[in-house]
Amino acid sequence: MAAKVKKGDKVVVLTGRDKGRTGEVIQVMPKENRALVRGVNLVKRHQRQTQTQEGGIISKEAAIDLSNLAVADPKDGKPTRVGFRILEDGRKVRFAKRSGDLIDG
């Protein structure tokens, strides 16, 4: 199945503690059906001190399920569903079903 959410996409969180927040996808994990989004779903982790890194409590992004994310419409930034379209030159591109604008390409 084609990927509806890709690295670098602007997404909106649909449910959970960070509902309504937007961020950029840092990493997609298709086997786990999860993604890392910059600035969303932050958790505190205790880090042991090493020669290169300082110890202490740090905040980092935790993975969030893809079903809780929606791609942001390029036109107005609101959540939209994603469709696929084949252009005249044969490329398969994603488009926002809300506005019809192309997401990539």
Swiss-Prot record:
InterPro entries documented for this protein: KOW, Rib_uL2_dom2, Ribosomal_uL24, Ribosomal_uL24_CS, Ribosomal_uL24_KOW, Translation_prot_SH3-like_sf
SUPFAM superfamilies according to UniProt: Translation proteins SH3-like domain (SSF50104)
SMART domains the UniProt entry points to: KOW
Gene Ontology annotations of biological process type: translation
The keyword tRNA processing appears for this protein: no
Gene Ontology CC annotations of this record: ribonucleoprotein complex; ribosome
Keyword RNA-binding: yes
PROSITE patterns: RIBOSOMAL_L24
Transmembrane segments: none
Pfam families from the UniProt entry: KOW, ribosomal_L24
Highest taxon, organism lineage: Bacteria
GO terms of molecular function: rRNA binding; structural constituent of ribosome
Family of this protein: Belongs to the universal ribosomal protein uL24 family.
SUBUNIT field: Part of the 50S ribosomal subunit.
Primary role: One of two assembly initiator proteins, it binds directly to the 5'-end of the 23S rRNA, where it nucleates assembly of the 50S subunit. One of the proteins that surrounds the polypeptide exit tunnel on the outside of the subunit.
Protein name: Large ribosomal subunit protein uL24
Protein source organism: Methylobacterium sp. (strain 4-46)
